[in-house]
Amino acid sequence: MGWENAPSHICRGGDLRGLAFCCPPIKYCPIHKALAVLKMSPEEFIRIKEEFGKRTKLGLGENTCFGSLVWCCKITKPCPYRDYELAKNNISPDEYMELKKQLAEEIIRNSQFFKEAVEVFVKKGIPKDIAEKCILETGDLKKAYEMAIKMIDKD
């Protein structure tokens, strides 16, 4: 699938990585709570997604709901507009999901939440690189901490 442990959409209870599948935050929905957790404004979220789109194929997709694949949902959710644009632009479902994974990491990495979480993990004795990897791979602090402890215990 291009992103083995891809989360559910935020509106379906997914973790913070699910922000990669969100529409622009123009109406009240669970995205606002997720952005509050990240300590990120809706404007900053939009900027990050639009800039990512400018330098990747996710910027394509003029016939999608919001004019760009950066705003499209997970590949497992049927969408004729997204699928048409993927085919038109020769983007495989795996490539699409890999790009969405990179987008999720970019959103989280650019948040105050990420910086603060990494600092806390480091204070708890977890190396910075492991802390970053675990937070980005899980989108959830509890799961990230558990994963980090397992990684450290292996060594």
UniProtKB/Swiss-Prot annotation:
Spell out the protein name for this chain. Answer: Uncharacterized protein MJ0115
